[in-house]
Curated annotation (Swiss-Prot):
Decarboxylates L-threonine-O-3-phosphate to yield (R)-1-amino-2-propanol O-2-phosphate, the precursor for the linkage between the nucleotide loop and the corrin ring in cobalamin. It comes from Caldanaerobacter subterraneus subsp. tengcongensis (strain DSM 15242 / JCM 11007 / NBRC 100824 / MB4) (Thermoanaerobacter tengcongensis). Keywords: Cobalamin biosynthesis, Lyase, Pyridoxal phosphate. It catalyses: O-phospho-L-threonine + H(+) = (R)-1-aminopropan-2-yl phosphate + CO2. Pathway: Cofactor biosynthesis; adenosylcobalamin biosynthesis. The modification N6-(pyridoxal phosphate)lysine is found at residue 213. SUPFAM superfamilies: PLP-dependent transferases (SSF53383). GO terms for molecular function: pyridoxal phosphate binding; threonine-phosphate decarboxylase activity. It is an enzyme of class 4 (lyase). Belongs to the class-II pyridoxal-phosphate-dependent aminotransferase family. One of its GO terms (biological process) is cobalamin biosynthetic process. NCBIfam families: L_thr_O3P_dcar. This is Putative threonine-phosphate decarboxylase.
Length: 367
């Protein structure tokens, strides 16, 4: 970003506050089962008369046990977004490679640091999958790599073996790599994709995760990152103190022990993904792209998302206009996977746009 240049506002999902009435929020990719019941007991135990432990020792111990690493490998933050910005700032990234469309905060973090990312377009014809051979080639132009795995808004992932090849290339170039795994726990076969086992082999690998997405509590901002002790120490030097409040710390200490909730969520969400994809693909004016996580990218074969969003809002449904993601336009929108009854409301509302004349019937739909 050039000196004196103003940054355009970056909009995110979950912004129900701009709209009136009770809405079913399909714009925010949060666990449809909601937070575990015991969370309220954990919150009651918070002592607001004291600062949180500035080193977050007990919280880091809980995370370390969950992911299988040492406390020295962990940093915590006010959501994954804080850690993404911290990474860009600590490594002074000016031109990292960002396969796109992707989470908007990657780009924003770099531009706020005075940089301009190198972009690699994820092709619709390839299902928006990350072509790691193209990444290997394009990374020659970059001073870092920021990769969503699974990626938002496309819902696609890259397997660990391919990540390992990317890391070897990055190591030869002596550049840092951030892999954002905010949604990885929703994946049915997540162990094939997670990069955590690679942290011990690569000093400049930083893996970021978000607690609030999978555990259904975006109001409690909590994220964590895993890296080598030297990388974590470097990030801590740039980090503001006490960015994780007492509520988030208390909940986080217990969250990762609830294995039943974790498995129940993964099973429920993946069953709903299959149901939603099947149902959405019966609607002629839509293209529903494959996904491995709790959201689905959709493309209109006719019309614009503005028309669809306006009509759905009148039915009490909020979707995510995806046109502000790089390389996407007004034909694209994203919906979260929610509870069955809510998902059916969305499906029926989208089908109903035929009858209302908002969308053309199947005889007049063109790709």
């Amino acid at each position: 970003m050039k000196e004196g240049e103003k940054m355009k506002p970056y909009e995110h999902g979950g912004n129900i506050y701009d709209y009136q009435g009770n809405l079913i929020d399909f714009s925010s990719n949060i666990n449809p089962l909601g937070p575990p019941e015991w969370i309220w007991e954990a919150i009651k135990e918070v002592d607001l008369s004291r600062y949180p432990d500035i080193k977050y020792r007990r919280l880091k111990e809980a995370i370390a046990e969950y992911v299988g690493c040492d406390r020295e490998n962990i940093i915590v933050g006010n959501g994954a977004a804080e850690l993404i910005h911290l990474f860009a700032r600590a490594f002074k990234l000016k031109k990292p490679l960002i396969p796109s469309p992707s989470f908007l905060e990657y780009e924003r973090a770099v531009k706020l640091n005075g940089g301009e990312p190198v972009y690699l377009k994820l092709e619709e014809e390839e299902g928006f999958r990350v072509n790691f051979a193209k990444v290997i080639s394009k990374i020659e132009e970059a001073d870092g790599l920021i990769l969503g795995n699974p990626n938002n808004p496309t819902g696609q992932g890259i397997i660990r073996e391919e990540i390992g090849i990317l890391l070897k290339k990055a190591e030869l170039m002596n550049i840092p790599v951030l892999i954002d795994e905010a949604f990885i726990e929703f994946m049915k076969d997540y162990k094939k994709y997670e990069a955590l086992p690679l942290v011990k082999k690569h000093d400049k690998l930083f893996v970021v995760r978000a607690v609030t997405k999978f555990f259904g509590m975006p109001g409690i901002r909590l994220g964590y990152g895993i890296g080598s002790p030297s990388l974590i120490q470097k990030l801590e030097e740039y980090k503001e103190p006490w960015t994780v409040n007492a509520f988030a710390e208390a909940v986080g200490r217990w969250l990762f022990k609830d294995r039943e909730y974790i498995e129940k969520t993964r099973e429920y969400v993946n069953a709903e993904i299959e149901h939603m994809l099947f149902s959405l693909r019966t609607i002629d004016y839509l293209v529903a792209f494959d996904t491995k996580v709790n959201f689905i990218l959709l493309k209109l074969k006719a019309g614009t998302v503005d028309e669809v969003k306006e009509k759905l809002l009148k039915k009490g449904i909020l979707i995510r206009d995806a046109s502000n993601f790089r390389y996407l336009d007004k034909r694209f929108f994203r919906v979260a996977v929610k509870r069955r009854e809510d998902n059916m409301c969305l499906i029926e509302a989208l089908r109903g746009l035929y009858e209302e004349g908002v969308m053309p019937d199947k005889e007049r739909v063109v790709v």
